[in-house]
Amino acid sequence: YKVYSLVNLSQLAGGMPDLEGFHTQEIELPQQKSLKMEEHNGRRYGTVVWRQYVLFPQRSGKMTIPSIKFEGIVVQQNRNIDPIDAFFNGGSTMVEVKKTIVAPSLTLQVDPLPSPRPANFSGAVGKFNISASLTPSEVKTNDALTLRITVSGSGNMKLMKAPVVNFPKDFETYDAKITDQTKVGRGGVSGNKIFDYLAVPRHPGEYTV
């Protein structure tokens, strides 16, 4: 949500949009907001990005990004006050006027996911690479080992669940420890998500995970 203004706008305040039907992640912006000059259609505007989100639709079909209202103060000249009277009386011809700005709503069409979906599909959509490592690769009976699965790329990584790993039956296993190394930016969500599985083999032998 970006505000454009041709006048001296101050004390800007805006609400939070109701982004129903989307998984949202807000891009962190400076708390202290100030207008920056920008040319648009041949005119110079004071602009400020109020809020910015990365959106992941949770259903297909037509969806609406709602409008929100902003309130601000505009300083403008009061034509009912004589400038000469104001000068000699120590007053001002300028007055503060409260203004309401409405950001228009947007509509988008969300295509369904390809079908048939894999039976183990968990909802992760994007471009991902996956790698795995076992540390150590040789252990003694009843010693712990760690299987690390690293998923890197970009997409809705916050919604990504831990992969299901089929350990040998006589391995004692524990829930995955999840390390989130993703960042939210203008291009979306990207980075790494690391899943560490601790397992303890109870019998000697050679096993495949």
Where are the model-predicted features located?
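Regulatory and interaction patches adjacent to catalytic/ligand-binding sites
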Residues: 2-208
